[in-house]
Amino acid sequence: MKKLLLCALLGIMSLSTTAKAPKVLTGIDMLERQNFKPLQGKRIGLITNPTGVNRYLKSTIDILHDAPNVQLVALYGPEHGVRGDIYAGAKVQDQKDEKTGLPIFSLYGKTRKATKEMLRGIDALVYDIQDIGSRSFTFISTMGLAMEAAAENGIELIVLDRPNPLGGLHVEGNVVEDDCVSFVSQFRIPYIYGLTCGELAKMLNAERMLANGVQCKLTVIKMKGWKRKMTFADTGLPWIASSPHIPQALTAWYYPTTGIVGELGYLSIGVGYTLPFQLFAASWIDAEELANAMIAQQMPGVTFRPIHLRPFYSTGKGEQLQGIQIHITNYKTVQLTPIQFVLMQEIARLYPEHSVMEHANQQRFSMFDKVCGSKQIRQRFMRRNQWSDIETYWNKDVKPFKILSKKYYLYR
């Protein structure tokens, strides 16, 4: 009997260990397996933040700093900083890293592209940041500008690849138009682009999407085990908050459902509450009424429930609000970005005296347009507050982009 119990216990322990082992090895994991061969003999600058960790949660900064055959000489901080303690939009200052003593150069302060002085003595830049798969999240812009700086200064850029938490099959939104190019829409890609950062880097380089068509010497350290159909949960990897308001991998799915409208600052989208990007709320909304209206739209892969809340900060701080919480029910069929436009449509119908576009601060329209990647979206929507008026325009580039981007797939 004791032997049977012991065997059962060992079996359970074995299953538990197996369940915890990640199915995917990221670029830094693979670089370690290669004994850092691509970095040998080079003076390295590292662009990273707290998401740059291996499968054991050891920081890429510490890994490269401690590796006997790697010469790490500088760090570069994107939005939120190398250690992740800077609020969204706040400038990052040049400083010294307390743990390693290495200089940290800001890529979100006076300049967003590394200068010649910042790159002096660097042979290769290494990029290791977990992105969230939406164009307006600025880390891919930092990567692209780093590619430009590398090209202009004759140095190599090495991307340590990581999963796209939205998978590799989702594509939504029009590509960025010339008058809306900005740090939140740096390249002519859709809002949801369905590529890993390594794949995106290859496409930006080969298709000459960087400024002035420059191309850099690019190396991508591929992952092992990642599939396009995977959600982040499928990878078995731990999630590190990619910004203060993306605390969980699941939040990456909700960011594109509310983030565009959130730029107007008119509705609470859960930032400042415990559900960032997962809701819409205001003091004048009837939660039951709006939830029923949104459910009646029968949008695929998503449903809604009434919610009552009092945000701790940001839009609606301290006010008693009502609204809807978004619940994604099918990650394969859901269309994420239309949710916010249908929401604005229903608000205009139910509460015309509070219709979003007519009552939001017009000074914020410019950022809304930049995040959309086109002024046409706002201008067409404002005519009747109908999603159907912009649906074709919003989706016009999806099929061509899917065809183009497939050329740069590193994973199936």
Could you describe each region identified by the protein language model?
Residues 1-22:
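Bacterial Sec-dependent N-terminal signal peptides
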Residues 71-79, 160:
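Short internal beta-strands
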Residues 84-88, 158-180:
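Glycine-rich, charge-decorated loop segments at or immediately adjacent to ligand/cofactor-binding or catalytic sites
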Residues 92-122, 134:
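Glycine-rich oxoanion-binding loops at beta->alpha junctions
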Residues 131-143:
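Glycine/threonine-rich flexible loop motifs
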Residues 180-256:
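Conserved anion/nucleotide-ligand pocket segment
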Residues 226-311:
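Glycine-rich, aromatic-lined ligand/substrate-binding cores of catalytic
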Residues 281-392:
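Conserved functional hotspot residues or short segments at active or partner-binding sites
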